[in-house]
Amino acid sequence: ITGTNGKSTTTKLIGDMIKKHNISAFVGGNLGKPLLDSLLAKKKFTHHVIELSSFQLELISSFNPKISVLLNISQDHLDRYIDFKDYINQKKKVFTNNKTGYNLISLDDTYCKNFYKKRKIINKISFSTKNKNADIYYNNFKIYNNFFNLNKKIKINKISRDLNGDFNYQNILVAYIVSKILKISKKIFLN
């Protein structure tokens, strides 16, 4: 999971959800535990939910996730990169080696939307709180699913006050998509 903002919240949401589904998961990366802890752990994990910063993506040469997520891109860390284009190129690396998995991309961000349109990315799934044409769309406490089930609506009755706001609705959409890919029940997703 990468993006300028929202990585930690999305990583935690997905990590909590898949653990409730009794999936053995390492949750960390830029958030909490370093990824190296997963490799050194006595317990072997079947899944990894990893928050990746642009700094970590710089070092990736072979990385083939089952699910890649790009939340948003805005001007940040420009002191580290040659220019903004270089920063964007680092963020795009989350998809570079994903040849068989799913690639989740927000349409609410101009840079991500352009990337979604221009790049030939396999198995891409768009999500949005603003664009009704996205594969997965959120509006007025409903998720509209046009990817897994055409015109399917899921009503969300309660959302924690901590998760209000468009950016958090995006995080919820990503968790929903992951729940569908991993065949996690609607009940666990809603909880």
Range-by-range predicted roles:
Residues 82-85, 92, 117, 121-191:
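Adenine nucleotide phosphate-binding catalytic loops in nucleotide-utilizing enzymes
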Residues 1-107, 111-122, 176-182:
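Phosphate-binding loop of NTP-binding sites
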